[in-house]
Amino acid sequence: MKLKPIIMAILEELHMENKFVSLKILINKLDKYKPSPRTLQSILKELIECNRVIVQGSASTTEYAINDVISNYRRFEFIYVVKDNEIAGILFKLSDRYRFYYDNEFLINKSKPIPSLDLQILPFDFNNIPAVFEENIPEGINREILETTSRTADEFQILTMLEDNIGDLSFTKTREIVKNKSSNPSYLSSLNEILGSNPKINVLKDLVVGIEDE
């Protein structure tokens, strides 16, 4: 579903209301777009199918409200993706894939999209963690240091432990954003200490280099 102005207006109105509202109220709120009941119901049906909107009641008592996407995936692991100190979306680790949804507020604000992930209502599905997120994880010795200190090689878990992120993306397990501060120790800023206390990765510990005088 393309991000048509009326779609964004529906999400914005439901977000501001933050409660169930009737079709009649929505039509009045969206008078600028002159939607017919059938057109509005069709758009709402699509938003319901992609977990953006929830519905209650039936026939003349039907009401609509903004949906917290997480409510449909509570049994799965998920992390928040932060862009420029704003919650951009949610990355879920499903049983057979990774799924990313842009956050409703991020869409409503018409914020700048994450590279390679155009703003859209529908989720993105991946077999692996998408490259735009995975590239934040260091390689080589720095990756080994991070895995050793965090005691996990799971890239999904490692994302939330990063402090030295690339660009404007970061990852967190809660919606709370702590600007320019992290509770995780920076492995790059503590490199000497980490190498000294981890013999597994301190491969040069007992190396002696002899230099002969000429």
Predicted features and spans:
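Short amphipathic alpha-helical elements of helix-turn-helix/winged-helix folds
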Residues: 9-17
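The alpha-helix within a helix-turn-helix
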Residues: 27-28
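Phosphate/dinucleotide-binding and metal-coordinating scaffold of catalytic cores
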Residues: 2-5, 18, 24, 33-39, ...
